[in-house]
Amino acid sequence: MMNALGLSVAATSTGSPFHDVCCYGAGIAGNIFALVLFISPLPTFKRIVRNGSTEQFSAMPYIYSLLNCLICLWYGLPFVSYGVVLVATVNSIGALFQLAYTATFIAFADAKNRVKVSSLLVMVFGVFALIVYVSLALFDHQTRQLFVGYLSVASLIFMFASPLSIINLVIRTKSVEYMPFYLSLSMFLMSVSFFAYGVLLHDFFIYIPNGIGTVLGVIQLVLYGYFRKGSREDSLPLLVTHT
């Protein structure tokens, strides 16, 4: 990530050792929770495979996450930024997970949703290819870092907004059956960690999108606590997976 001046966070120093420890601690925590976020939908897809149907689950969070991971992966490579290899590593793993989830969704969706999600998947790779081409062809290294950095902020905001349709479904059905708890909790913890990281670094590009993600995460967790009594999982512990 970059700070508001367009400098790589990896190349900046905050001065105070304690402050630096807090910054890097928040960043490492964010990476850990990001990995947890990537694996959190596994119970949902286990259910989809077991039932042979996507039911009312939405593929949009995984489509948005795939695009976000690809953009952040590109940002973390030396072609765009120096010293942020872990950004590329985490997001390459994330992209593989999101691609696997999307492919599974397509395999078990009805014909209409299969065509829709497949088209969106093609669009995602088309947009990413265009971003790579434009950033290499039209920008030098410094402006390329700014260009891709702003795109990563935009993609993060879109990714965090993707659960809005699920929030609407929860309110309409008064049930959290189709809002996986692991996904909501992991997004909240990841957002809080990176929000703290951005605030400690005074980095606009980090704390703004993750601040939005934190608010949305709180909303989802509040809705889960309020509506879980009306769900089929009512008799199950909060952190149980479907078996």
Swiss-Prot record:
Residues 1-15 form the signal peptide. Residues 46-56, 112-118, 168-180, 225-243 are cytoplasmic. Residues 27-112, 147-229 form the MtN3/slv domain. Residues 16-24, 80-90, 140-146, 202-203 are extracellular. Its main location: membrane. The chain crosses the membrane at residues 25-45, 57-79, 91-111, 119-139, 147-167, 181-201, 204-224. InterPro entries: SWEET (IPR047664), SWEET_rpt (IPR004316). It is a multi-pass membrane protein. Pfam families: MtN3_slv (PF03083). GO terms for cellular component: membrane; plasma membrane. One of its GO terms (biological process) is carbohydrate transport. It is found in: Cell membrane. Coiled coil: none annotated. Keywords: Cell membrane, Membrane, Repeat, Signal, Sugar transport, Transmembrane, Transmembrane helix, Transport. Forms homooligomers and/or heterooligomers. Belongs to the SWEET sugar transporter family. Mediates both low-affinity uptake and efflux of sugar across the plasma membrane. This is Bidirectional sugar transporter SWEET2a. It comes from Oryza sativa subsp. japonica (Rice).
